[in-house]
From Swiss-Prot:
InterPro entries listed in its UniProt record: AICAR_Tfase_dup_dom_sf, Cytidine_deaminase-like, MGS-like_dom, MGS-like_dom_sf, PurH-like
Species this chain originates from: Klebsiella pneumoniae (strain 342)
Domain free text: The IMP cyclohydrolase activity resides in the N-terminal region.
GO process terms (BP): 'de novo' IMP biosynthetic process
Keyword Isomerase appears in the UniProt entry: no
Alphabetized NCBIfam families for the sequence: PRK00881.1, purH
Catalyzed chemical reaction(s): (6R)-10-formyltetrahydrofolate + 5-amino-1-(5-phospho-beta-D-ribosyl)imidazole-4-carboxamide = 5-formamido-1-(5-phospho-D-ribosyl)imidazole-4-carboxamide + (6S)-5,6,7,8-tetrahydrofolate; IMP + H2O = 5-formamido-1-(5-phospho-D-ribosyl)imidazole-4-carboxamide
Name of protein: Bifunctional purine biosynthesis protein PurH
Length: 529
């Protein structure tokens, strides 16, 4: 039989009061004596519940504007006391056992996220008594239940009903794990906040100091286990951040289809982040984390049709992302034309979902509409370390471009150049993108030499019978030699957009002039590894 412990006395002290009244009512109905502090005690008393203030129980008042409330031997002795071992000393000092502690902590993260939050505001929202009680109860989980999540309230009452008012050791142990996770995450937030300020005391700007603290503490919550990882011999799971502020694959809701795989999630992220770059109705098709077709148009149906035409072979089994609602007509076009792993869009109509439901393996996700992109950090794991950098949210407008060639680009060439520049940002380096009339016609990805990426883009376009002549070409980084320009000219490229910055820029520009190509510098690189 599980080591059951009856719950006869509970201490409740919560900042997030959602569900606490109902939980306290359920405990009282089962004969549990309630201890509480401050606002929680007042709330319970106002609801007519019999509750004893901790200050009355300890005989010691709350003091220092509530800074000292529960830091008392009668509280922590009641929590930490080992049943059957410390009973004598507890009786000697009038310490009653506390069988359950229900605590959640001051809202530190919400406080420091507020605009204009001062250091003093942050300091006053560092909980001391709460984490101390949580850790005490978790340490003594053999005898005490610690509850830090309101989502556990109902399950706890159900188990008490099934066990004559008791909780099993398995449950107490599971609750203790959640408690230690809770305090670890809480302390990490505080450490990150204060750690980010240390360099500021030595003359660095707060903005620079806030990006990269001396010690980086990360907290992610497991959303799901994967059948396997990138390959079948690798185990994997998907973890997400709390309080994600931007529509993303992490916040998306899966409406239908089988469970997402590791590779599905990685590819869906690549597709969604790319389609976010466009304001017009857009479609991005991704395979192995690389766009294989991108287009914008007046409707997502036409955008999909044009994106698909870039590379139908690679689109098979791909991921499709839209920046508008998935409608029935577009859903039908996809299902009728190709095998698709995942479709993600801000929303999906009921009619569209009825159509995609006919294909049980098709996963349909919605992520909600997005506004501005949210700055943050990107991480890359290396053996024994972690590379951390700002998220690449760099963008250029037409007014920021520099035309360095003799020939000026036409309006259409300029539009195509900006379009394929946005796409190139999401193609693995070395990246070359050919585009014409707001659709990709050839994409060369991941080659060790830039000229071979350019050649592959041309081969792709030729294989699909797409006209390259008059197209724009984007390169994610500068051309180190003129050979990439010569290769582009050979297939009919008339406009090139690239960062510039090579020691041979003059040679590259001269090649563009020699071929009558308009060349644009962005002064911004978009390596992607």
């Amino acid at each position: 039989m599980q080591q059951r412990r009856p719950v006869r006395r509970a201490l409740l002290s919560v900042s997030d009061k959602a569900g606490i009244v109902e939980f306290a009512q359920a405990l009282t109905a089962r004969g549990v004596e309630l201890l509480s502090t401050g606002g929680t005690a007042r709330l319970l008393a106002d609801k007519g519940l019999p509750v004893t203030e901790v200050s009355d129980y300890t005989g010691f008042p709350e003091m220092m504007d509530g800074r000292v409330k529960t830091l008392h031997p009668k509280v922590h002795g009641g929590i930490l006391g080992r049943r059957g071992q410390d009973d004598g000393i507890m009786q000697q000092h009038g310490i009653a056992p506390i069988d359950m502690v229900v605590v959640n902590l001051y809202p530190f993260a919400q406080t420091v996220a507020r605009e204009g939050c001062s250091l003093e505001d942050a300091v006053e929202n560092i909980d001391i008594g709460g984490p101390t009680m949580v850790r005490s109860a978790a340490k003594n989980h053999k005898d005490v239940a610690i509850v830090v999540k309101s989502s556990d309230y109902d399950a706890i009452i159900n188990e008490m009903d099934a066990n004559e008012g008791s909780l099993t050791l398995n449950t107490r142990f599971d609750l203790a794990i959640k408690a230690f996770e809770h305090t670890a995450a809480y302390d990490s937030m505080i450490a990150n906040y204060f750690g980010s300020m240390v360099p500021a005391y030595h003359g660095e700007s707060q903005e620079a100091a806030g990006r990269f603290p001396r010690t980086l503490n990360l907290n992610f919550i497991k959303k799901q286990d994967m059948r396997y990882g990138e390959n079948s011999h690798q185990q994997a799971a998907f973890y997400i951040e709390e309080n994600v502020k931007e529509a993303s694959v992490a916040t998306a809701t899966q409406l239908q289809g089988k469970a997402l795989s590791y590779n599905n999630i990685a590819d869906t992220d690549a597709a969604l982040e790319c389609v976010k770059e466009f304001n017009e109705p857009a479609c991005v098709i991704v395979k192995h984390a690389n766009p294989c077709g991108v287009a914008v148009s007046n409707s997502i149906l036409d955008a999909y049709d044009r994106a698909y035409k870039t590379d139908p072979t690679s689109a098979f089994g791909g991921i499709i992302a839209f920046n508008r609602e998935l409608d029935a007509e577009t859903a039908q076009a996809i299902i009728s034309r190709q095998f698709v792993e995942v479709i993600i869009a801000p929303s999906a109509s009921e009619e569209a979902l009825k159509i995609t439901a006919a294909k049980q393996n098709v996963r349909v996700l919605t992520c909600g509409q997005w506004d501005a992109r949210v700055a943050g950090l990107d991480f890359k794991r290396v053996n024994g370390g972690l590379l951390v950098q700002d998220r690449d949210l760099g963008m250029v407008t037409a007014g920021e471009l520099r035309v360095v060639s003799k020939r000026q680009p036409s309006e259409q060439e300029l539009r195509d150049a900006l379009f394929c520049w946005k796409v190139a940002k999401f193609v693995k380096s070395n990246a070359i993108v050919y585009a014409k009339d707001n659709m990709t016609i050839g994409i060369g990805a991941g080659q060790m030499s830039r000229v071979y990426s350019a050649k592959i883009a041309g081969i792709k376009a030729g294989d699909e019978g797409l006209e390259v002549k008059g197209s724009a070409m984007a390169s994610d980084a500068f051309f180190p030699f003129r050979d990439g320009i010569d290769a582009a000219a050979a297939v009919g490229i008339t406009c090139v957009i690239q960062p510039g910055g090579s020691i041979r820029d003059d040679e590259v520009i001269a090649a563009a002039d020699e071929h009558g190509i308009a060349m644009i510098f962005t002064d911004m690189r978009h390596f992607r590894h």
